[in-house]
């Protein structure tokens, strides 16, 4: 009988040990699942935070050029029709004729009343002032403008106070030294944005 009791006691101990091992294994599995879940949430939170920061930085980054008050988009019958003066030179908004200048490179100045309509129609104007001529500058500006198939003009603009002017609807940037990155950033920021009243 004592042997039976000992055998029963050993079986009971084995069962308890097996239960304890199973319980420990279940706890390890639960812990691993919890760690994986927490890890996945942490990775998702870091990714969401990074994406949110990137979007915020992109949205809050200052736009190129200087913002100017717009002067409306009234049409006038002809380029020589009287109208109030523009608030920028070259103009960035205001009175203009019904048609637009062809997109691309121009060898002669584009009348203000014509180029303003191009700006309203989603365009960007790149203009230069070189009283003594500047073929190298013009060639570099042409290369930039030709890289954009539509919505960009290049033309001389005699008499302005800087060598280079970039204009879009309600925006202007003027400077003397060629800066390809600055020009390209301005064009990419504003070309293709239509400004017609809806």
Residue ranges with predicted function:
Residues 61-114:
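Surface-exposed, low-hydrophobicity interaction/linker segments
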Residues 52-63:
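Hydrophobic single-pass membrane-insertion segments
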Residues 40-53:
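Hydrophobic membrane-insertion alpha-helices, especially the h-region
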Residues 1-40:
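Terminal, Lys/Arg-rich, intrinsically disordered segments and adjacent short helical elements
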Residues 143-198:
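Helix-rich interaction surfaces within compact, conserved domain-sized segments
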Residues 105-147:
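Mid-length scaffold segments of soluble, non-membrane domains
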């Amino acid at each position: 009988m004592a042997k039976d009791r000992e055998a029963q006691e050993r079986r009971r101990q084995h069962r308890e040990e097996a239960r304890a091992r199973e319980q420990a294994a279940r706890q390890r599995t639960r812990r691993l699942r919890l760690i994986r879940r927490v890890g996945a949430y942490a990775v998702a939170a870091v990714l969401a935070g990074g994406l949110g920061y990137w979007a915020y930085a992109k949205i809050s980054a200052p736009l190129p050029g200087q913002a100017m008050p717009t002067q409306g988009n009234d049409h006038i019958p002809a380029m020589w029709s009287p109208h109030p003066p523009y608030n920028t030179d070259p103009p960035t908004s205001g009175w203009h004729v019904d048609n637009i200048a062809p997109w691309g490179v121009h060898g002669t100045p584009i009348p203000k009343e014509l180029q303003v309509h191009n700006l309203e129609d989603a365009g960007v104007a790149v203009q230069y002032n070189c009283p003594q001529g500047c073929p190298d500058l013009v060639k570099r500006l042409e290369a930039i403008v030709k890289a954009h198939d539509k919505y960009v003009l290049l033309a001389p603009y005699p008499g302005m106070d800087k060598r280079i002017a970039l204009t879009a609807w309600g925006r202007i940037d003027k400077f003397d030294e060629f800066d390809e990155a600055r020009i390209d950033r301005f064009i990419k920021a504003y070309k293709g944005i239509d400004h017609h009243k809806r």
